[in-house]
């Protein structure tokens, strides 16, 4: 992890999922938690421990920003997995093995080590190492002062192989049921922390760069006969995560025609919705047309990191029955609905219809924020991103219609029952 080149913003980057997104910020090259609520965490999307018989290590630099009564501590959580044991689904459970500092103790699963009373642990490093030990995994957690590099404490444990398999995450303020952690945090309790230089290595990890989610999250397009001199009109929307003031605000659209890529221009990202929309009249509806969306992420050192999202604007179907994939009510207990999403791709429909309740109030946990507008928008986007994360590949190659229903506007039964 090198956030040092990333501009300040809400969205942490395509390699991570933050719980909840609205409670995290990149500030001066580190991820800062903005809430004292429990179980605020960051999952690595590209690194999962799948080979517990291998070796691994994780290291992170931590600064305590705020520590009050009932300080929930900070550190790693490993072996995080859901019943589905799928890297996206794993992001929404709090089970796993704790390896961090809670109170004045170094904690590694069931093992603890009392830290010296005089130790300065406002800025510390944490190093977790694992390697095979008999039929289990030997773990060692070390903490040290970041400035002096003085070791403050160390604790070891041998745990079952299965207890380390799954996602790995950083946690600010262990404890409580984070999924239900919405609402106002009581005064005088909790803690906040800042994480930098998260480093992961070892053959216990499977590294999958394809798991990145963003900056371009997904796209949706439509193709419509305008019945005017504009002919067929193609509209396409590209979504990114919430970017910062200094970040690039433009998305480019390129299409492949006659074997050549043509640049059709740029569209500006809406600063609330983080959507860029293109409208292209007089579209040739008779042929399949590959497209790619490009977002060029600016770095502090002046370099540019491009991100591409590819798909196909399919020819308008004629002379046969229309093939439509119709879906509704994606509640997140089945997230990411992988069999359904895969079947839609294999079906290769002419059009996809999502007829409502793409999200529910409970999605991803951490409650609903209705005001003020800034955090409320981020709270909504975070839940909506789960929909796109699940169906992004099922939406990119055919027109997609997405209709809101009651839960999409956080008002169950708004259409009836005295709503």
Where are these regions (language model features)?
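Extracellular glycan-recognition surfaces and repeat-rich motifs
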Residues: 3-31
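Secretory/extracellular carbohydrate-interaction modules
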Residues: 33-112
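Beta-strand-rich interaction surfaces with strong enrichment in secreted/lumenal proteins
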Residues: 44-50, 110-118, 157-159, 264-268, ...
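Residues within well-ordered beta-strands of beta-sheet-rich folds
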Residues: 55-63, 123-129, 194, 199, ...
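Exposed beta-strand face motif in extracellular beta-rich ectodomains
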Residues: 56, 122, 287-291
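Carbohydrate-binding surfaces in secreted/extracellular proteins
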Residues: 58-60, 117-157
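Extended, low-complexity, turn-rich repeat/linker tracts enriched in Gly/Pro/Ser/Thr and Asp/Glu
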Residues: 64-70, 132-135, 245
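Divalent metal-dependent phosphoesterase catalytic cores across multiple superfamilies
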Residues: 147-190, 201, 205-419
């Amino acid at each position: 992890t090198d956030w040092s080149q990333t501009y300040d913003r809400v969205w942490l980057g395509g390699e991570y999922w933050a719980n909840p997104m609205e409670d995290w910020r990149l500030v001066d090259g580190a991820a800062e938690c903005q809430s004292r609520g429990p179980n605020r965490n960051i999952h690595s999307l590209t690194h999962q421990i799948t080979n517990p018989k291998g070796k691994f290590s994780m290291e992170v630099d931590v600064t305590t920003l705020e520590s009050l009564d009932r300080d929930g501590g900070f550190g790693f959580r490993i072996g995080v997995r859901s019943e589905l044991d799928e890297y996206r689904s794993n992001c929404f459970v709090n089970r796993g093995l704790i390896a961090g500092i809670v109170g004045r103790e170094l904690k590694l699963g069931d093992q603890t080590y009392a830290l010296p009373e005089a130790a300065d642990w406002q800025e510390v490093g944490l190093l977790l190492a694992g390697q095979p030990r008999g039929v289990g995994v030997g773990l060692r957690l070390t903490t040290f002062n970041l400035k002096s590099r003085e070791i403050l404490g160390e604790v070891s444990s041998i745990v079952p192989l299965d207890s380390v398999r799954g996602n790995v995450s950083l946690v600010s303020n262990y404890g409580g049921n984070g999924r239900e952690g919405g609402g106002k945090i009581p005064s005088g309790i909790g803690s906040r922390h800042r994480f930098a230089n998260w480093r992961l290595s070892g053959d216990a990890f499977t590294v999958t760069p394809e798991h990145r989610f963003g900056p371009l999250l997904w796209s949706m397009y439509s193709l419509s006969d305008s019945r005017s001199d504009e002919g067929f009109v193609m509209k396409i929307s590209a979504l990114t995560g919430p970017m910062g003031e200094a970040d690039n605000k433009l998305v480019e659209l390129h299409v492949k025609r006659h074997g050549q890529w043509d640049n059709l221009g740029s569209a500006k990202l809406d600063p609330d919705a983080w959507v860029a929309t293109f409208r292209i009249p007089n579209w040739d509806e008779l042929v399949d047309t590959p497209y790619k969306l490009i977002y060029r992420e600016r770095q502090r050192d002046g370099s540019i990191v491009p991100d591409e999202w590819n798909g196909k604007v399919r020819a308008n179907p004629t002379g046969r029955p229309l093939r439509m994939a119709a879906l509704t009510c994606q509640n997140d207990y089945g997230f990411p609905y992988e069999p359904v999403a895969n079947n839609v791709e294999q079906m290769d429909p002419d059009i996809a219809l999502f007829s409502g309740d793409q999200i529910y109030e409970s999605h991803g946990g951490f409650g609903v924020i209705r005001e003020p507008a800034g955090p409320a928008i981020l709270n909504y986007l975070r839940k909506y991103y789960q929909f796109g994360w699940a169906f992004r590949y099922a939406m990119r190659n055919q027109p997609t219609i997405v209709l809101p229903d009651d839960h999409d506007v956080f008002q169950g039964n708004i259409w009836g029952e005295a709503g």
